[in-house]
Every structure is written in structure tokens, then in C-alpha cells.
């Protein structure tokens, strides 16, 4: 689960964020920021306990709650958008 990942990962910044991206964060805490493209700058301001995940074909921004992610997965499956999973 995302909560397990958040709890397990060390190396959080001073705001308690997990950042695996070229990023500039301001007034952001408890969030997970991931971007696969090292040449893309991710700018985040004012988020709390959120996920920002940028992959090859999907940008996802949502609360860092396991239920939110599960709901997104169910919605994508129901909409026949499985290629984005």
C-alpha cells in the first residue's frame, strides 16, 4: 500500500515528503512526488498528504490514501483504460 511505502521509505525531506524527481516544493508536507523524466521539473506548492506520480503516459495527483488509489484503479478498469495501469 502507499501508506506502507510512505512509512517504510527513509530519506524524507524536512517536510516529510518522499521525492524521487527533479522538484521544487513549497509549503508541501507528507507527500510522495515521483517523476520518471529527470529532465522534467516538478513544481509543487501547498499540498499535504498527496501523491504526484508522473510516468510515461500518466500523471496522477490524488490524496495519499489507499482508498483513493484503489478507486482510481477501479474507475480506469471500468472505463476500459487498462493500458494506463
Predicted regions and their residues:
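Left-handed beta-helix
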Residues: 2-85
